[in-house]
Regions:
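Substrate-binding/active-site clefts of carbohydrate-active enzymes
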Residues: 1-7, 14-23, 27-38, 44-165
Length: 167
């Protein structure tokens, strides 16, 4: 209901300010409120994988840890404070959720959950078909445990950080 007739402002933390941090973005909340913004849509905020990384900074859609934040942006506590301050100022916070794939070195792979990914005939984790996707690994939504872990990560961000929703 709170999305009806709301003004949504998309934010890429890395490019929003010279510092590219949650703290620097938080300082601009009053200006965004004056502009009439109601909902802040944050582009992916998670740590970016290292394996097959594209460029120096990597692809923010190559998520390494769904419960973490990109350390370039600050700490999880910095993010928590940003969300709290945004709520005080009347904003809702939604996150661009990367649900189809993760980085090939996502913590789930390190924990031995290779079966949470689509595998090729040799048992190797697959990148999505088509395009230049070598920096991401396609998730296997037929695996119930993976779906539960994905939901758990989303619940964590809602219950522990107070995020309002996901795109």
């Amino acid at each position: 209901e709170w999305t009806k007739n709301a003004t949504i402002y998309e934010v890429n933390i890395r490019q929003f300010s010279p510092e590219g941090t949650f703290v620097a973005f938080q300082k601009q909340l009053p200006r965004l409120k004056e502009m009439g913004v109601d909902i802040l849509l944050l582009m992916p905020i998670h740590p970016i994988g290292e394996l097959n990384r594209k460029g120096r900074l990597g692809n923010s859609y190559a998520v390494r840890d769904y419960k973490g934040v990109n350390p370039e942006f600050g700490s999880i506590d910095d993010f928590r404070v940003l969300v709290k301050e945004a709520h005080k100022q009347g904003f809702k916070i939604i996150i661009d959720w990367v649900a189809n794939h993760s980085s090939p070195d996502n913590r789930w792979v390190a924990q031995g959950h290779k079966d949470w990914y689509k595998l090729d005939s040799l048992g190797n984790i697959q990148a999505p078909i088509g395009g230049e996707w070598e920096d991401v690994a396609e998730l296997n939504f037929e695996n119930k445990a993976m779906r539960i872990a994905m939901i758990d990560a989303m619940k964590y961000l809602v219950s522990e950080i107070d995020v309002d929703g996901f795109r």
